[in-house]
Amino acid sequence: MRERSILNHRNKLCNYLIVSAFLILFYSCVKDKPNVQSTGNINISATHKVYITNEGNFMYNNSSVSFYNPDTKQVVQDIFKAQNPNITLGDVCQSIQKIGNNFYLVVNNSNKIVIVSADDFKYQQSITGFVSPRYILPVSFSKGYVSDLYANKIAVVNLSTKNIVSYIPCPGWTEKMIQFYNKVFVTNLYRNYLYVIDVLSDAIIDSIYVGKYASGIVLDKNENLWVLSSGESSSNQLPKLHKINPVTHQVLSTFTFSSADRPNNLVIDAARENLYFINQHIYKMSISATQLPTQYFIASQNNNFYSMEWNAVLDELYVSDAMDYVQNSTIYRYNKNGQLIHTFKAGINASGFWME
């Protein structure tokens, strides 16, 4: 059965292993193909910018970052290598976060976070000591939280000294996080709970029961949280979408998908009025809706939709198509009405976005 997307995270590890085995056979017979070349000179000072992290292939140390100028439609592949020719980014670049005047590149299978200058993408330093980091969230000017696949804890990073200073015990695969005043809400794929951390004490103060394989979380204009869980067929746990009050931690609404659905990759538009998620196709749902959408917003034309993000600056949707997980991803850029604006190539398994 063709899964909606490898972003159904538990399948991502299996696919990595399958693709890695294929690559060992494939590359033993043919020479490596080079990355897609730049279509122009790097203009890091562009008015609008989109950075795309490309995971690469698991165990092949070939992750990269693509740069896209939405005004000129210029694409620069592997901007990290272009600006740092003697440094390898690492294995599986999972996500990107801007903190101050630096970008933090979370390199999952290299157990590190690589810091580059936002001015020129030049390497600054790395933070090491992680087990398998996923995302970094700045919670104050001097402190950040890092989720992790295997560590069973959240790493607390000093953003001034750029090192791990403590940990917050949290069982399971911690994934995306969102801050609401002095609370951080942490999704967890292996547990059925959304964990609540007090930023002042760096301690878990509550847990909210949600569906299995929860990974998507957004905050709407009414200051309600939305959490998307992909479910688990082996334990008959259906996918669910929860609306949660972040003040009281009460679940306000629960929307349940069918056993055939595998929704993932929850995002919200610039007005924070409409939700979008991948479920083979791309669906749109108003935050005031009383039921799940039945008609897709953007149809999959035999695409392998892998990841997406809303560009809040230009009010546009960017969607990654991972193709066969071996060749370079295709990025589709849509306006808020779902009309295609531009299609371009990024690196292998494009999954993370930063827009400004």
How would you name each of these model-derived features?
Residues 25-28:
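C-terminal motif of bacterial Sec signal peptides marking the signal peptidase cleavage site
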Residues 3-17:
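Bacterial N-terminal signal peptides that target proteins for export
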Residues 30-356:
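Predominantly soluble domains enriched in secretory-pathway, periplasmic, or organellar proteins
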